[in-house]
Amino acid sequence: TVKNTGSVSGKDIVELYYTAPYTKGGIEKSSVNLAGFVKTKELEPNESEELQVTFKLEDMASYDAKVNKAYVLEAGDYGISLRADAHNVIATETITVDNTIVYDENNKRSTDEEVATNKLDFAAGSFESLSRKDHFANYDAATAAPVNFSMPEEIKAVYENNSNYDPEKYNNDEDVMPVTGAKNHVMLEDVRGLDYDDPEWDLLMDELTVKEMNSLIARAGYQTTEIKSINKVRTVEADGPVAITNNFTEESTIGFPTEVTLSNTWNRELAYRFGQSMGKMADEMNISGWYGPAMNMHRAAFGGRNFEYYSEDPFIAGVMASDTVNGALEYGVYPMLKHFAFNDQEANSGWQLCTWVDEQTAREIYLKPFEMCVKNGKYCALMAANCQLGYMPAQACAPLLKDILRNEWGFRGWVITDWYSSKWYQDADRMIRNGADGMLASYDSDTNNVSDTTSATGVLAMRQASKDILYTVVNSRAYEPENLNPSMQNWVKGVIATDILILLL
């Protein structure tokens, strides 16, 4: 219960935290973690409000990247506290976990489709991670500037870019060429609302030609292309995180305060209303996809995109972004969450900026906001980041885009690249084979068109990418009946209804 004991009206925030047991040399843990929050209504002097904040036991699990290679809820006492902020405790209780719980293949977390296990070992690098052991005894070593900037020989041996990437090297002889150009008479609107794995989708995908799929993949910048054979309408997508601008018409909307300003309110209802406003404006402009919200971390105060991102705290970012996403989805506009992932530096971000990160840090901090949004919002899309994850481009990183995003989190939607400028690593073949679906280009370049259109592996990748795009589009505002048939105005519908009624009489 929150009571206003002051002399003027106001709001307050109920913040719930947990403190997990820490073993020196064991799994690294923060001393205190935000588990939930809610903001009061406007309370008059002496007015009270009763609020409830809940979370699951598994939400207190930490990721053990070294031993179990899974999320682990260690046995011990967990302090649950209401606080004014991360430091000032108002009230506390203790929960005791009698036995360690490992969320492995026999006991995955309730929100996972597949068990979470190490997928990013290749990106761990050789840096020293900061540890709580002995009161951060390794602080100087962990925060010291690097002295060696050379790429190890074993990484050079597997490093690829447009100069040495050959899609045929990765062809699978066991792949079977899919059907293309079939006449099954299934239109895209026929699969609206159907499950991603419904057999009707196979009949639809069999109808696409290689040329149609390539057009959908290669020219996905600010649009998805028309495919007349399946009655696929052209859709428009637009930037950016706090305003809508149509790149084709230059029509734009009002701009809202930055997402970090929104986060500082701790107001979930306001985040939802912000999403509604973005969705409504996009809908009124006939825009179906929104290049936002952006939810990378404020890793440093001078991050080049900090104005687009919510917070330095992954939980706050995930909660506020999820509410924003669900607000936009109310208008049938699919948010394109960006920049997935680890995009916290603008300088050289598209030119071989290699980000090295251990699995625990990746999952508990940098991936968490995206995970929360994907699991809480249906029919989303994502924009992959320009940076490298280890030695792999994030836009062509199967462990990230397939293993974690789709297999573990259960994402069903499409992934677009960041701005496509024929950089040294941007190659459509490589990207669609590793989990991306559309190239953010509105013109033809050397590498945004798929080159391997004759192998079974190549065409299967095109089919998968096309399905991901179509699944998102058909479940959006673009395929609402009034948008699909805009010529049928309300007065026409009224006349038809009247005629039917007269016939029935």
Q: Where are the regions that the model predicts?
A:
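Short beta-strand elements
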Residues: N88-S110
